């Protein structure tokens, strides 16, 4: 697939003549049959969504997605967004410039009906781009997904929108949900999915209550309690016994802060209220607040060791010339088998000519499991049981769950340097 395909980059129109003709027809239809969901409150790009649709390009047999979001009162061109679309493997006859058919919600294509929900706008978080790139790689490279019917809805990374999306997915009669990588959205949605008997696969929602309270939730990453326990053990190994802990206002940050404080008590370390009295500072939260906190502390003249948490393990955290030994990030690790990591990296390099970012491996691993479920696997009503009791053999390693937690999930400590993040060896 070419790098400019709208399935992997937002805002680019189709370039081949047939696709462009089909897309123009798709734009004119602006049909609610595509399944878009209006937002009641101001959202990531505004209140009103128009021009939602999907087309399939027959020259590469890949999905092409396009949606347009427009804020009320905002001047200038509308911002291209993937907001809420239904995609099926039907050929839209794009190559010849023929009519592009809109697929209704009730698809005639057999196979799993899979809801995909996350924060899709890379301007709000770079993790959105990573998640969509994992979907693009899977659609191009993972066998078993051809019979899947997809339904995309943006959850805004917040609880209210997450619940709205869940209700819409249930009405759409989804068999399975993937995504909701924000803990805020995942928790509110998981309860509704549980009532409907729908499994939720999430690549990056770490909050403990997601799996403790919802047996239908399965995560492909460490939990807050594992991140917190591994972090505190690492702090103790460095003889940093007095710890100042802060968090942003997200559900993820607040829950991880609580887990860290509980782990400090179990380990016999001391939480101090003032950073001046601490050996080390810890900040739990999303990427943007973490980056801002790091910059603010250094600009304030603090040279005290600072540890950020999983969401900050991203190239978008930034580089630093003199932060080795001063700034760290605890995030998701990979198994010791180098072949597993190389496989994911090679697929990403093939399409995007770059190394994958945070959450890519977890997202791709989730999609490999989805492919096994979709490719002649259990019926929709048996998915929960299959996820609870099956070991899935994937190119990234074996996958199985213990009460919703990924067996063998690992963490890693990183430090920012002149060229970005590098692992800490001890």
How would you label these PLM feature ranges?
Residues 1, 7, 17-23, 29-33, ...:
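Extracytosolic ligand-binding ectodomains
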Residues 12, 25-26, 38-42:
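Hydrophobic alpha-helical membrane-insertion segments
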